[in-house]
């Protein structure tokens, strides 16, 4: 009888794992619209962490930086180098805050999904998860990037910016227009897919082996999360730089 039960229990366990879900939604009604409340909650937490950390690190700035101020200046220099490389020496300055904010929000959001036990915070329905675990967040970030590179191109070239759509030949007009729509799609789906996949893998591995296997997977998730933030920020800066350049 035990021999018969063993395969059955194994199959039941596999079935339970196959039903693992990440990011069940907690809905709010705002102005007649249904929004994902858990995304707003976790986003506010991430923003509070960033603002609090920055305030503490630079509350007493010194001429010769030490400690937290030194770390913040190192991060700022990293953002300057990243933005300068992608946008160019003459135009990069105003875009450092935008690229830096994008990177920090995505980086902390991704790491919060890997490090913070969101599941212990109970909601009336649904569950908390990293902000970037929701497609609405990644699409919003991608759309902000789209608005930024359209603004950069129009500010630099005026209406002449739209001339790029018929270069090098007007035949490419549909393809060039389509390219501008695929940029935010690729940014949003790449970030969303990687973060969701990481949390699903951890959730599946925690079920059969809760103590040993998930640890290296979590470290891999932390590394991947950082890489995804860097890729998003780099591509955003590259798109902005491309919009201000002449057609190649």
UniProtKB/Swiss-Prot annotation:
Please give the Gene Ontology molecular function terms for this protein: proton-transporting ATP synthase activity, rotational mechanism
What InterPro entries does this protein map onto? ATP_syn_F0_a_bact/chloroplast (IPR045082), ATP_synth_F0_asu (IPR000568), ATP_synth_F0_asu_AS (IPR023011), F0_ATP_A_sf (IPR035908)
Protein name (record): ATP synthase subunit a, chloroplastic
**Leader sequence segment:** none
The entry's function note states: Key component of the proton channel; it plays a direct role in the translocation of protons across the membrane.
Where are the bilayer-spanning segments?
38-58, 96-116, 135-155, 200-220, 221-241
Species name:
Pinus koraiensis (Korean pine)
Give the primary localization class.
plastid
* Cited Gene3D superfamilies: ATP synthase, F0 complex, subunit A
Domain of life (superkingdom): Eukaryota
**Entry keywords, A to Z:** ATP synthesis, CF(0), Chloroplast, Hydrogen ion transport, Ion transport, Membrane, Plastid, Thylakoid, Transmembrane, Transmembrane helix, Transport
Protein family membership: Belongs to the ATPase A chain family.
Q: How does it sit in the membrane?
A: Multi-pass membrane protein
Assembly and interaction partners: F-type ATPases have 2 components, CF(1) - the catalytic core - and CF(0) - the membrane proton channel. CF(1) has five subunits: alpha(3), beta(3), gamma(1), delta(1), epsilon(1). CF(0) has four main subunits: a, b, b' and c.
Location in the cell reads: Plastid, Chloroplast thylakoid membrane
- Would the keyword Transmembrane turn up in this protein's UniProt record? yes
A single Gene Ontology CC annotation of this entry is:
plasma membrane
């Amino acid at each position: 009888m035990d021999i018969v039960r063993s395969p059955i229990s194994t199959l039941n366990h596999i079935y339970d794992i196959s039903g693992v879900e990440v990011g069940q939604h907690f809905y709010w009604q705002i102005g007649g619209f249904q929004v994902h409340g858990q995304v707003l909650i976790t986003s506010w937490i991430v923003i509070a962490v960033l603002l609090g950390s920055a305030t503490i690190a630079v509350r007493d700035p010194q001429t010769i930086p030490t400690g937290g101020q030194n770390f913040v200046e190192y991060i700022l220099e990293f953002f300057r180098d990243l933005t300068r490389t992608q946008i160019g020496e003459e135009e990069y300055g105003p875009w450092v805050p935008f690229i830096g904010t994008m990177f920090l929000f995505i980086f902390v959001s991704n790491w919060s999904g890997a490090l913070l036990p969101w599941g212990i915070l109970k909601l009336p329905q649904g569950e908390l998860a990293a902000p970037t675990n929701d497609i609405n967040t990644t699409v919003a970030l991608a759309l902000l990037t789209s608005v930024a590179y359209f603004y950069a191109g129009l500010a630099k070239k005026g209406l002449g910016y739209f001339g790029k759509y018929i270069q090098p030949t007007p035949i490419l007009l549909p393809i060039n227009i389509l390219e501008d729509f695929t940029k935010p799609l690729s940014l949003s789906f790449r970030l969303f897919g990687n973060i969701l996949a990481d949390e699903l893998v951890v959730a599946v591995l925690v079920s059969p082996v809760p103590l040993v296997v998930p640890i290296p997977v979590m470290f891999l998730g932390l590394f991947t999360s950082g890489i995804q933030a860097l890729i998003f920020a780099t591509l955003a800066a590259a798109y902005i730089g491309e919009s201000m350049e002449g057609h190649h």
